[in-house]
Protein backbone atom coordinates (compact mmCIF):
# COMPACT_ATOMS: atom_id res chain seq x y z
CA UNK A 1 0.00 0.00 0.00
CA UNK A 2 1.31 3.44 -0.95
CA UNK A 3 2.46 5.70 1.89
CA UNK A 4 0.71 9.09 2.21
CA UNK A 5 2.89 12.19 1.79
CA UNK A 6 1.37 15.42 3.11
CA UNK A 7 1.76 18.52 0.96
CA UNK A 8 2.31 21.69 3.01
CA UNK A 9 1.98 24.72 0.76
CA UNK A 10 3.76 27.90 1.83
CA UNK A 11 3.14 30.02 -1.28
CA UNK A 12 1.30 32.62 0.80
CA UNK A 13 4.06 32.87 3.40
CA UNK A 14 7.51 31.89 2.09
CA UNK A 15 6.42 32.37 -1.52
CA UNK A 16 5.29 35.92 -0.87
CA UNK A 17 8.79 36.68 0.44
CA UNK A 18 9.93 36.65 -3.20
CA UNK A 19 11.52 40.06 -3.87
CA UNK A 20 8.96 42.34 -5.51
CA UNK A 21 5.90 40.28 -4.56
CA UNK A 22 3.16 41.76 -2.39
CA UNK A 23 -0.30 40.21 -2.40
CA UNK A 24 -3.47 41.90 -1.21
CA UNK A 25 -5.78 40.17 1.25
CA UNK A 26 -8.25 39.36 -1.53
CA UNK A 27 -5.51 37.94 -3.74
CA UNK A 28 -4.31 35.72 -0.90
CA UNK A 29 -7.84 34.43 -0.36
CA UNK A 30 -8.18 33.69 -4.08
CA UNK A 31 -4.96 31.68 -4.06
CA UNK A 32 -5.92 29.88 -0.82
CA UNK A 33 -9.25 28.78 -2.31
CA UNK A 34 -7.45 27.46 -5.39
CA UNK A 35 -4.99 25.58 -3.16
CA UNK A 36 -8.00 23.99 -1.45
CA UNK A 37 -9.27 22.87 -4.88
CA UNK A 38 -5.80 21.48 -5.54
CA UNK A 39 -6.30 19.49 -2.32
CA UNK A 40 -3.13 20.39 -0.44
CA UNK A 41 -3.04 19.16 3.15
CA UNK A 42 -1.82 22.37 4.78
CA UNK A 43 -1.91 26.03 3.70
CA UNK A 44 0.57 28.24 5.51
CA UNK A 45 -1.46 31.43 5.25
CA UNK A 46 1.12 33.87 6.59
CA UNK A 47 3.08 35.36 9.48
CA UNK A 48 0.41 37.22 11.53
CA UNK A 49 2.72 39.23 13.79
CA UNK A 50 4.54 40.80 10.82
CA UNK A 51 1.84 43.37 9.94
CA UNK A 52 -1.87 44.18 10.42
CA UNK A 53 -2.49 43.26 6.78
CA UNK A 54 -0.84 39.88 7.23
CA UNK A 55 -2.88 39.23 10.38
CA UNK A 56 -6.09 40.10 8.51
CA UNK A 57 -5.19 37.83 5.58
CA UNK A 58 -4.56 34.83 7.87
CA UNK A 59 -7.75 35.56 9.81
CA UNK A 60 -9.86 35.76 6.63
CA UNK A 61 -8.35 32.59 5.15
CA UNK A 62 -8.91 30.74 8.44
CA UNK A 63 -12.56 31.80 8.39
CA UNK A 64 -13.34 31.37 4.68
CA UNK A 65 -11.28 28.43 3.41
CA UNK A 66 -12.38 24.91 4.24
CA UNK A 67 -10.66 21.58 3.65
CA UNK A 68 -6.92 22.03 4.26
CA UNK A 69 -5.42 22.74 7.67
CA UNK A 70 -4.61 26.46 7.94
CA UNK A 71 -1.20 27.21 9.47
CA UNK A 72 0.32 30.44 10.75
CA UNK A 73 4.00 31.09 11.37
CA UNK A 74 5.40 32.36 14.68
CA UNK A 75 8.85 32.84 16.09
CA UNK A 76 9.56 31.14 19.43
CA UNK A 77 8.16 34.23 21.12
CA UNK A 78 4.88 34.47 23.07
CA UNK A 79 3.57 37.57 21.28
CA UNK A 80 4.07 35.86 17.89
CA UNK A 81 2.24 32.76 19.10
CA UNK A 82 -0.60 34.87 20.51
CA UNK A 83 -1.00 36.62 17.15
CA UNK A 84 -1.01 33.29 15.31
CA UNK A 85 -3.52 31.75 17.72
CA UNK A 86 -5.85 34.74 17.49
CA UNK A 87 -5.68 34.86 13.68
CA UNK A 88 -6.46 31.14 13.43
CA UNK A 89 -9.32 30.97 15.93
CA UNK A 90 -12.06 30.55 13.28
CA UNK A 91 -10.23 27.86 11.29
CA UNK A 92 -11.93 24.53 10.75
CA UNK A 93 -8.51 22.89 11.25
CA UNK A 94 -5.53 24.95 12.46
CA UNK A 95 -1.82 24.62 13.06
CA UNK A 96 0.72 26.90 14.73
CA UNK A 97 4.15 26.66 13.14
CA UNK A 98 6.89 27.96 15.44
CA UNK A 99 10.61 28.06 14.77
CA UNK A 100 14.05 28.97 16.07
CA UNK A 101 17.51 28.59 14.53
CA UNK A 102 19.73 25.72 15.67
CA UNK A 103 22.94 26.13 13.64
CA UNK A 104 26.05 27.45 15.39
CA UNK A 105 26.34 30.37 12.97
CA UNK A 106 22.75 31.50 13.67
CA UNK A 107 22.93 30.95 17.41
CA UNK A 108 26.21 32.86 17.71
CA UNK A 109 25.67 35.79 15.34
CA UNK A 110 21.89 36.22 15.01
CA UNK A 111 20.38 34.98 18.27
CA UNK A 112 23.45 35.49 20.47
CA UNK A 113 22.33 32.56 22.60
CA UNK A 114 23.80 29.28 23.76
CA UNK A 115 22.47 25.93 22.52
CA UNK A 116 20.83 25.31 25.91
CA UNK A 117 19.06 28.68 25.77
CA UNK A 118 17.82 27.93 22.26
CA UNK A 119 16.49 24.51 23.27
CA UNK A 120 14.70 26.07 26.26
CA UNK A 121 13.07 28.72 24.02
CA UNK A 122 11.93 26.03 21.58
CA UNK A 123 10.33 23.95 24.33
CA UNK A 124 8.61 26.95 25.94
CA UNK A 125 7.25 28.08 22.57
CA UNK A 126 5.72 24.69 21.81
CA UNK A 127 4.27 24.38 25.32
CA UNK A 128 2.75 27.85 25.03
CA UNK A 129 1.25 27.10 21.60
CA UNK A 130 -0.71 24.16 23.04
CA UNK A 131 -3.13 26.66 24.62
CA UNK A 132 -4.40 27.42 21.10
CA UNK A 133 -4.23 24.06 19.29
CA UNK A 134 -2.96 20.52 19.58
CA UNK A 135 -1.52 20.65 16.02
CA UNK A 136 1.91 22.24 16.43
CA UNK A 137 4.81 22.21 14.01
CA UNK A 138 8.34 23.05 15.12
CA UNK A 139 11.10 24.03 12.68
CA UNK A 140 14.80 23.98 13.52
CA UNK A 141 15.85 26.83 11.23
CA UNK A 142 19.06 26.13 9.27
CA UNK A 143 18.85 22.47 10.27
CA UNK A 144 21.16 21.31 7.49
CA UNK A 145 24.03 23.38 8.93
CA UNK A 146 23.27 22.32 12.51
CA UNK A 147 24.99 19.65 14.59
CA UNK A 148 23.04 16.43 14.07
CA UNK A 149 23.23 15.37 17.71
CA UNK A 150 21.93 18.77 18.82
CA UNK A 151 19.05 18.45 16.35
CA UNK A 152 18.07 15.15 17.95
CA UNK A 153 18.12 16.78 21.40
CA UNK A 154 15.95 19.70 20.31
CA UNK A 155 13.46 17.59 18.37
CA UNK A 156 13.03 15.13 21.26
CA UNK A 157 12.47 18.03 23.67
CA UNK A 158 9.82 19.77 21.53
CA UNK A 159 8.01 16.47 20.89
CA UNK A 160 7.80 15.96 24.66
CA UNK A 161 6.45 19.52 24.89
CA UNK A 162 3.65 18.80 22.40
CA UNK A 163 4.98 19.17 18.84
CA UNK A 164 3.16 16.90 16.40
CA UNK A 165 5.27 17.78 13.34
CA UNK A 166 9.02 18.38 13.31
CA UNK A 167 10.31 20.23 10.27
CA UNK A 168 13.84 19.94 8.88
CA UNK A 169 14.52 23.10 6.84
CA UNK A 170 17.37 23.47 4.38
CA UNK A 171 17.04 27.20 4.97
CA UNK A 172 19.88 28.37 2.73
CA UNK A 173 19.73 25.59 0.13
CA UNK A 174 23.02 24.13 1.35
CA UNK A 175 22.52 20.38 1.41
CA UNK A 176 22.66 17.76 -1.35
CA UNK A 177 20.32 14.81 -2.01
CA UNK A 178 22.75 12.22 -0.64
CA UNK A 179 23.52 14.19 2.52
CA UNK A 180 19.86 15.08 3.14
CA UNK A 181 18.87 11.43 2.76
CA UNK A 182 21.42 10.52 5.44
CA UNK A 183 20.21 13.31 7.76
CA UNK A 184 16.57 12.22 7.58
CA UNK A 185 17.57 8.59 8.14
CA UNK A 186 19.73 9.65 11.11
CA UNK A 187 16.87 11.57 12.71
CA UNK A 188 14.45 8.68 12.22
CA UNK A 189 16.91 6.23 13.81
CA UNK A 190 17.96 8.42 16.73
CA UNK A 191 14.88 10.39 17.86
CA UNK A 192 13.49 8.09 20.53
CA UNK A 193 9.96 9.54 20.84
CA UNK A 194 9.07 9.85 17.15
CA UNK A 195 6.03 7.53 17.18
CA UNK A 196 3.08 9.27 15.54
CA UNK A 197 5.07 12.45 14.85
CA UNK A 198 5.29 13.76 11.27
CA UNK A 199 8.75 14.46 9.83
CA UNK A 200 8.57 17.40 7.43
CA UNK A 201 11.17 18.91 5.08
CA UNK A 202 11.45 22.44 3.71
CA UNK A 203 14.03 22.90 0.93
CA UNK A 204 15.36 26.06 -0.71
CA UNK A 205 16.77 26.17 -4.21
CA UNK A 206 20.05 28.08 -3.85
CA UNK A 207 21.99 25.27 -5.54
CA UNK A 208 19.08 24.20 -7.76
CA UNK A 209 18.51 21.09 -5.62
CA UNK A 210 15.29 21.89 -3.74
CA UNK A 211 13.13 19.35 -5.58
CA UNK A 212 15.86 16.69 -5.65
CA UNK A 213 16.48 17.13 -1.92
CA UNK A 214 12.75 16.91 -1.18
CA UNK A 215 12.42 13.69 -3.17
CA UNK A 216 15.48 12.26 -1.46
CA UNK A 217 13.92 13.06 1.92
CA UNK A 218 10.70 11.28 0.93
CA UNK A 219 12.73 8.22 0.02
CA UNK A 220 14.44 8.43 3.42
CA UNK A 221 11.07 8.41 5.18
CA UNK A 222 9.88 12.03 5.44
CA UNK A 223 6.10 12.30 5.76
CA UNK A 224 5.50 15.92 4.69
CA UNK A 225 7.04 18.16 2.01
CA UNK A 226 6.83 21.96 2.18
CA UNK A 227 6.54 23.60 -1.23
CA UNK A 228 5.45 26.68 -3.15
CA UNK A 229 3.57 26.98 -6.44
CA UNK A 230 6.00 27.64 -9.31
CA UNK A 231 8.86 27.36 -6.81
CA UNK A 232 8.68 31.03 -5.81
CA UNK A 233 10.27 32.22 -2.59
CA UNK A 234 13.28 33.86 -0.96
CA UNK A 235 16.41 34.20 -3.13
CA UNK A 236 16.36 31.30 -5.62
CA UNK A 237 13.00 30.06 -4.35
CA UNK A 238 11.61 26.90 -2.77
CA UNK A 239 10.87 23.37 -3.90
CA UNK A 240 8.18 23.68 -6.57
CA UNK A 241 4.88 22.04 -5.63
CA UNK A 242 4.10 20.95 -9.18
CA UNK A 243 7.52 19.35 -9.69
CA UNK A 244 7.47 17.43 -6.42
CA UNK A 245 3.94 16.04 -6.75
CA UNK A 246 4.25 15.18 -10.45
CA UNK A 247 7.59 13.46 -9.86
CA UNK A 248 6.04 11.39 -7.07
CA UNK A 249 3.11 10.53 -9.34
CA UNK A 250 5.15 9.67 -12.43
CA UNK A 251 7.63 7.62 -10.38
CA UNK A 252 5.12 5.94 -8.11
CA UNK A 253 6.82 2.69 -9.04
CA UNK A 254 9.99 3.90 -7.32
CA UNK A 255 8.72 5.94 -4.34
CA UNK A 256 5.50 3.99 -3.63
CA UNK A 257 3.77 7.06 -2.17
CA UNK A 258 0.71 9.14 -2.97
CA UNK A 259 -0.08 12.80 -2.25
CA UNK A 260 -3.81 13.08 -2.88
CA UNK A 261 -3.21 16.20 -4.98
CA UNK A 262 -5.80 16.94 -7.66
CA UNK A 263 -3.38 16.97 -10.59
CA UNK A 264 -6.01 18.39 -12.93
CA UNK A 265 -5.75 21.72 -11.07
CA UNK A 266 -1.96 22.08 -11.51
CA UNK A 267 -2.11 24.25 -14.65
CA UNK A 268 -4.82 26.54 -13.29
CA UNK A 269 -3.00 26.99 -9.97
CA UNK A 270 0.31 27.81 -11.64
CA UNK A 271 -1.28 30.39 -13.94
CA UNK A 272 -3.19 32.03 -11.08
CA UNK A 273 -0.09 32.43 -8.91
CA UNK A 274 1.94 33.75 -11.85
CA UNK A 275 -0.75 36.31 -12.67
CA UNK A 276 -1.29 37.56 -9.11
CA UNK A 277 2.39 37.67 -8.11
CA UNK A 278 3.62 39.06 -11.41
CA UNK A 279 6.35 36.40 -11.48
CA UNK A 280 6.23 34.84 -14.94
CA UNK A 281 6.88 31.13 -15.34
CA UNK A 282 10.05 30.55 -17.42
CA UNK A 283 9.18 28.76 -20.68
CA UNK A 284 11.59 25.91 -19.88
CA UNK A 285 10.20 25.42 -16.35
CA UNK A 286 9.51 21.76 -15.61
CA UNK A 287 5.84 20.67 -15.62
CA UNK A 288 4.22 24.12 -16.06
CA UNK A 289 6.51 26.04 -18.44
CA UNK A 290 5.21 26.91 -21.92
CA UNK A 291 7.74 24.50 -23.44
CA UNK A 292 7.21 21.65 -20.96
CA UNK A 293 5.07 19.75 -23.48
CA UNK A 294 6.21 21.51 -26.67
CA UNK A 295 8.15 19.72 -29.41
CA UNK A 296 10.04 21.35 -32.30
CA UNK A 297 12.61 18.74 -33.29
CA UNK A 298 11.42 16.82 -36.33
CA UNK A 299 12.44 13.47 -34.82
CA UNK A 300 10.60 14.22 -31.57
CA UNK A 301 7.52 15.52 -33.40
CA UNK A 302 7.37 12.39 -35.53
CA UNK A 303 7.59 10.21 -32.42
CA UNK A 304 4.94 12.14 -30.46
CA UNK A 305 2.53 12.14 -33.40
CA UNK A 306 2.90 8.38 -33.72
CA UNK A 307 2.81 7.64 -29.97
CA UNK A 308 2.76 10.39 -27.31
CA UNK A 309 4.68 8.37 -24.71
CA UNK A 310 7.79 8.21 -26.90
CA UNK A 311 8.75 11.71 -25.72
CA UNK A 312 6.27 12.56 -22.93
CA UNK A 313 6.33 10.94 -19.49
CA UNK A 314 2.94 12.35 -18.45
CA UNK A 315 -0.14 13.37 -20.40
CA UNK A 316 -0.38 17.19 -20.14
CA UNK A 317 -4.18 16.89 -20.09
CA UNK A 318 -3.86 15.10 -16.74
CA UNK A 319 -2.42 18.35 -15.34
CA UNK A 320 -5.12 20.60 -16.78
CA UNK A 321 -3.34 21.62 -19.98
CA UNK A 322 -5.06 21.33 -23.36
CA UNK A 323 -2.48 18.87 -24.67
CA UNK A 324 0.92 18.60 -26.30
CA UNK A 325 2.13 21.42 -28.50
CA UNK A 326 3.86 20.82 -31.82
CA UNK A 327 5.93 23.95 -32.43
CA UNK A 328 6.69 24.48 -36.09
CA UNK A 329 10.18 25.85 -36.61
CA UNK A 330 13.36 25.23 -38.55
CA UNK A 331 13.88 21.84 -36.86
CA UNK A 332 10.40 20.56 -37.75
CA UNK A 333 9.90 17.74 -40.21
CA UNK A 334 7.45 17.08 -43.02
CA UNK A 335 5.26 14.81 -40.84
CA UNK A 336 4.52 17.57 -38.31
CA UNK A 337 3.99 20.13 -41.07
CA UNK A 338 1.53 17.86 -42.87
CA UNK A 339 -0.31 17.16 -39.59
CA UNK A 340 -0.62 20.89 -38.90
CA UNK A 341 -2.07 21.53 -42.35
CA UNK A 342 -4.62 18.76 -41.79
CA UNK A 343 -5.58 20.25 -38.39
CA UNK A 344 -6.13 23.59 -40.14
CA UNK A 345 -8.53 21.92 -42.58
CA UNK A 346 -6.31 21.65 -45.68
CA UNK A 347 -6.40 18.52 -47.82
CA UNK A 348 -3.57 18.97 -50.30
CA UNK A 349 -1.74 16.97 -52.92
CA UNK A 350 1.79 15.73 -52.35
CA UNK A 351 3.11 18.26 -54.85
CA UNK A 352 1.37 21.13 -53.04
CA UNK A 353 2.65 19.96 -49.66
CA UNK A 354 6.19 19.79 -51.03
CA UNK A 355 5.95 23.36 -52.33
CA UNK A 356 4.54 24.63 -49.05
CA UNK A 357 7.12 22.74 -46.98
CA UNK A 358 9.97 24.25 -49.00
CA UNK A 359 8.57 27.75 -48.41
CA UNK A 360 7.96 26.96 -44.75
CA UNK A 361 11.58 25.85 -44.25
CA UNK A 362 12.83 28.98 -46.00
CA UNK A 363 10.86 31.25 -43.65
CA UNK A 364 11.53 29.11 -40.55
CA UNK A 365 15.26 29.70 -40.95
CA UNK A 366 14.61 33.40 -40.30
CA UNK A 367 11.61 33.39 -37.97
CA UNK A 368 11.52 31.88 -34.47
CA UNK A 369 8.47 29.68 -34.06
CA UNK A 370 5.83 29.93 -36.76
CA UNK A 371 2.25 30.43 -35.61
CA UNK A 372 -0.92 29.17 -37.23
CA UNK A 373 -1.34 32.61 -38.81
CA UNK A 374 2.12 32.26 -40.37
CA UNK A 375 1.19 28.87 -41.83
CA UNK A 376 -2.10 30.27 -43.12
CA UNK A 377 -0.26 33.12 -44.83
CA UNK A 378 2.22 30.73 -46.44
CA UNK A 379 -0.59 28.54 -47.79
CA UNK A 380 -2.56 31.45 -49.20
CA UNK A 381 0.49 33.07 -50.77
CA UNK A 382 2.03 29.92 -52.25
CA UNK A 383 -1.13 28.25 -53.52
CA UNK A 384 -2.49 31.51 -54.85
CA UNK A 385 0.40 32.43 -57.08
CA UNK A 386 0.75 29.36 -59.29
CA UNK A 387 4.06 28.06 -60.57
CA UNK A 388 4.97 31.25 -62.46
CA UNK A 389 7.17 31.86 -65.50
CA UNK A 390 9.83 33.88 -63.72
CA UNK A 391 11.65 33.80 -60.40
CA UNK A 392 13.77 36.52 -58.85
CA UNK A 393 16.65 36.63 -56.39
CA UNK A 394 17.39 39.94 -54.70
CA UNK A 395 21.18 40.17 -54.55
CA UNK A 396 21.39 43.44 -52.67
CA UNK A 397 19.61 46.75 -52.16
CA UNK A 398 21.42 49.89 -51.05
CA UNK A 399 19.28 52.66 -49.56
CA UNK A 400 20.21 56.33 -49.41
CA UNK A 401 19.53 59.56 -51.26
CA UNK A 402 19.98 57.46 -54.37
CA UNK A 403 19.02 53.79 -53.90
CA UNK A 404 20.39 50.94 -55.97
CA UNK A 405 18.97 47.45 -56.42
CA UNK A 406 20.62 44.43 -58.01
CA UNK A 407 18.56 41.36 -58.90
CA UNK A 408 18.96 38.06 -60.69
CA UNK A 409 16.00 36.89 -62.80
CA UNK A 410 15.56 33.57 -64.56
CA UNK A 411 12.88 31.50 -66.27
CA UNK A 412 10.91 31.23 -69.54
CA UNK A 413 13.97 31.28 -71.77
CA UNK A 414 15.91 33.72 -69.57
CA UNK A 415 19.05 32.23 -68.04
CA UNK A 416 19.99 34.05 -64.83
CA UNK A 417 20.15 37.65 -65.97
CA UNK A 418 21.55 40.11 -63.45
CA UNK A 419 20.24 43.64 -63.53
CA UNK A 420 20.87 46.78 -61.47
CA UNK A 421 19.06 50.10 -61.28
CA UNK A 422 19.28 53.28 -59.26
CA UNK A 423 16.34 55.43 -58.25
CA UNK A 424 14.97 57.69 -55.52
CA UNK A 425 13.89 54.80 -53.29
CA UNK A 426 14.76 51.13 -52.75
CA UNK A 427 11.41 49.78 -53.97
CA UNK A 428 11.46 51.90 -57.14
CA UNK A 429 15.02 50.76 -57.82
CA UNK A 430 14.03 47.12 -57.20
CA UNK A 431 11.06 47.14 -59.58
CA UNK A 432 13.00 49.02 -62.27
CA UNK A 433 15.82 46.46 -62.08
CA UNK A 434 13.29 43.64 -62.56
CA UNK A 435 11.69 45.45 -65.53
CA UNK A 436 15.10 45.90 -67.11
CA UNK A 437 15.99 42.21 -66.69
CA UNK A 438 12.73 41.08 -68.28
CA UNK A 439 12.63 43.77 -70.93
CA UNK A 440 9.14 44.77 -69.89
CA UNK A 441 7.63 48.20 -69.31
CA UNK A 442 5.14 48.08 -66.43
CA UNK A 443 3.77 50.93 -64.36
CA UNK A 444 3.27 50.51 -60.62
CA UNK A 445 -0.28 51.64 -59.76
CA UNK A 446 -0.50 50.51 -56.11
CA UNK A 447 1.92 49.28 -53.47
CA UNK A 448 0.70 48.16 -50.05
CA UNK A 449 2.45 46.54 -47.07
CA UNK A 450 0.68 44.85 -44.15
CA UNK A 451 1.80 42.76 -41.19
CA UNK A 452 0.29 39.29 -41.39
CA UNK A 453 1.49 38.07 -38.00
CA UNK A 454 2.77 39.64 -34.78
CA UNK A 455 6.18 39.98 -33.18
CA UNK A 456 9.50 41.50 -34.14
CA UNK A 457 10.02 38.82 -36.80
CA UNK A 458 6.46 39.03 -38.15
CA UNK A 459 5.66 38.05 -41.71
CA UNK A 460 4.92 41.01 -43.94
CA UNK A 461 2.65 40.78 -46.97
CA UNK A 462 3.14 43.08 -49.95
CA UNK A 463 0.39 43.69 -52.50
CA UNK A 464 1.12 45.39 -55.82
CA UNK A 465 -1.04 46.42 -58.75
CA UNK A 466 0.80 47.00 -62.02
CA UNK A 467 -0.43 48.24 -65.39
CA UNK A 468 0.69 46.66 -68.64
CA UNK A 469 -0.87 47.48 -72.03
CA UNK A 470 -3.86 49.05 -70.29
CA UNK A 471 -4.54 45.97 -68.12
CA UNK A 472 -4.15 45.76 -64.31
CA UNK A 473 -2.38 42.77 -62.75
CA UNK A 474 -2.23 42.00 -59.03
CA UNK A 475 0.58 40.22 -57.19
CA UNK A 476 1.32 39.29 -53.57
CA UNK A 477 4.52 38.44 -51.75
CA UNK A 478 5.20 37.15 -48.25
CA UNK A 479 8.41 37.27 -46.22
CA UNK A 480 9.99 38.47 -42.99
CA UNK A 481 12.03 40.76 -45.31
CA UNK A 482 9.91 43.50 -46.91
CA UNK A 483 12.33 43.96 -49.84
CA UNK A 484 12.11 40.25 -50.63
CA UNK A 485 8.32 40.26 -50.22
CA UNK A 486 8.15 43.24 -52.61
CA UNK A 487 10.19 41.39 -55.24
CA UNK A 488 7.96 38.31 -54.87
CA UNK A 489 4.82 40.41 -55.22
CA UNK A 490 6.09 42.19 -58.33
CA UNK A 491 7.10 38.90 -59.99
CA UNK A 492 3.74 37.42 -58.99
CA UNK A 493 1.99 40.20 -60.90
CA UNK A 494 4.31 39.92 -63.92
CA UNK A 495 3.76 36.15 -64.05
CA UNK A 496 0.07 36.83 -64.69
CA UNK A 497 0.81 38.88 -67.80
CA UNK A 498 0.25 37.04 -71.04
CA UNK A 499 2.72 38.16 -73.67
UniProtKB/Swiss-Prot annotation:
A single BP term in Gene Ontology: L-leucine biosynthetic process
Residues engaged in binding Mn(2+): 14, 202, 204, 238
Pathway given in the UniProt record: Amino-acid biosynthesis; L-leucine biosynthesis; L-leucine from 3-methyl-2-oxobutanoate: step 1/4
Subcellular location: Cytoplasm
Keywords annotated in UniProt: Amino-acid biosynthesis, Branched-chain amino acid biosynthesis, Cytoplasm, Leucine biosynthesis, Manganese, Metal-binding, Transferase
Enzyme class: transferase
Reactions listed under catalytic activity: 3-methyl-2-oxobutanoate + acetyl-CoA + H2O = (2S)-2-isopropylmalate + CoA + H(+)
PROSITE patterns hit by this protein: AIPM_HOMOCIT_SYNTH_1, AIPM_HOMOCIT_SYNTH_2, PYR_CT
Enzyme Commission code(s) on record: 2.3.3.13
Segments of this protein annotated with the region Regulatory domain: 391-499
MF terms in GO: 2-isopropylmalate synthase activity; acetyl-CoA C-acetyltransferase activity; manganese ion binding
Coiled-coil regions listed in the entry: none
Regions that span the bilayer: none
Domain of life of the native organism: Archaea
SMART domains linked to this entry: LeuA_dimer
GO cellular component term, pick one: cytoplasm
Residue span(s) of domain Pyruvate carboxyltransferase: 5-267
A Pfam family hit: HCS_D2
Cofactor: Mn(2+)
Function: Catalyzes the condensation of the acetyl group of acetyl-CoA with 3-methyl-2-oxobutanoate (2-ketoisovalerate) to form 3-carboxy-3-hydroxy-4-methylpentanoate (2-isopropylmalate).
Family: Belongs to the alpha-IPM synthase/homocitrate synthase family. LeuA type 1 subfamily.
Name of protein: 2-isopropylmalate synthase
Organism annotation: Pyrococcus furiosus (strain ATCC 43587 / DSM 3638 / JCM 8422 / Vc1)
Lineage, opening ranks: Archaea, Methanobacteriati, Methanobacteriota, Thermococci, Thermococcales
